[in-house]
Amino acid sequence: MAVCIIDHDNIRGVIYFEPVHGKDKVIGLKSGTYSLIIHRYGDISQGCDSIGSPEIFIGNIFVNRYGVAYVYLDTDVNISTIIGKALSISKNDQRLACGVIGISYINEKIIHFLTINENGV
């Protein structure tokens, strides 16, 4: 399993990638449709400007009027090929937030839904 933590301005969330699908929740966006895109590099030293070119379009997420997107995407991405790369949340080709995809501990007893609130908890 792989995981990506997004935390930029008021946009926060944790997305887990499993062999069959990706799922979780993202908060802090205005209502509308956004794209999840995997980029070439996992370098966030200059924010989303240093993550390189888009490589894999994961899918669209739909944010409700409360600023919450519940993410559940079927994708055939090979997890071992995305470790160390970046995931961006984008709208109209503008990268709004990004994070590095890393390896996550696998524990079948844990439900993989996590929200980070405005206090970082």
Curated annotation (Swiss-Prot):
Keywords: Disulfide bond, Host cytoplasm
Gene3D superfamilies documented for this protein: Superoxide dismutase, copper/zinc binding domain
GO process terms (BP): superoxide metabolic process
GO cellular component: host cell cytoplasm
Superkingdom in the source lineage: Viruses
Disulfide pairings: C48-C98
A GO MF label: metal ion binding
Compartments it resides in: Host cytoplasm
Family from the record: Belongs to the Cu-Zn superoxide dismutase family.
Function in brief: Virion protein with no enzymatic activity.
Annotated protein name in UniProt: Cu-Zn superoxide dismutase-like protein
Organism from which the protein derives: Vaccinia virus (strain Ankara)
Lineage of the species this protein comes from: Viruses, Varidnaviria, Bamfordvirae, Nucleocytoviricota, Pokkesviricetes
